[in-house]
């Protein structure tokens, strides 16, 4: 059984902790003392229009190069593109469910709600994810061969 603890501090390190972090979560004061980390944290705040820097980024601050690389890639992938922002968040949630990442499920569900996800849409989305998991398991368990009409061939 996992223990749950309520954490809170002045730098936004708050929330219900399901597990103890295996890495240090940087405070705002620590981030300000490192130019690379401070720059990424400032960009996170500016990009999101929020004073909050999530615990994920605070953990990545232990490796400034990884923090910079990951933030840059996430901004690119989740930024403007062909897919609308809500669809991108829903894909992120589905993958997070498949990977069993509660942190990612919660953070991207919050982001999806901020982008307009309704309770009805959320329920329907979760039903689709659940059905996909069920039918994927059945197909894999039964080793059903792929129909010729479904095969994706390389284009010219």
Which residues make up each language-model segment?
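Hydrophobic alpha-helical segments
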Residues: 1-156
């Amino acid at each position: 059984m996992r223990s749950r603890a309520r954490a809170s501090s002045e730098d936004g390190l708050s929330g219900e902790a399901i597990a103890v972090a295996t890495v240090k979560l940087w405070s705002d004061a620590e981030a300000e003392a490192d130019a690379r980390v401070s720059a990424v944290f400032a960009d996170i705040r500016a990009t999101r229009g929020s004073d909050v820097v999530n615990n994920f980024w605070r953990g990545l601050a232990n490796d400034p190069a990884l923090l910079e690389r990951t933030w840059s890639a996430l901004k690119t992938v989740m930024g403007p593109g062909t897919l609308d922002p809500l669809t991108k968040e829903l894909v992120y949630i589905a993958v997070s469910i498949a990977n069993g990442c509660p942190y990612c499920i919660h953070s991207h569900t919050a982001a999806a709600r901020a982008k307009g996800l309704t309770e009805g849409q959320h329920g329907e989305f979760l039903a689709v994810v659940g059905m996909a998991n069920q039918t994927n398991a059945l197909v894999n368990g039964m080793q059903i061969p792929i129909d010729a009409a479904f095969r994706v061939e390389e284009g010219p």
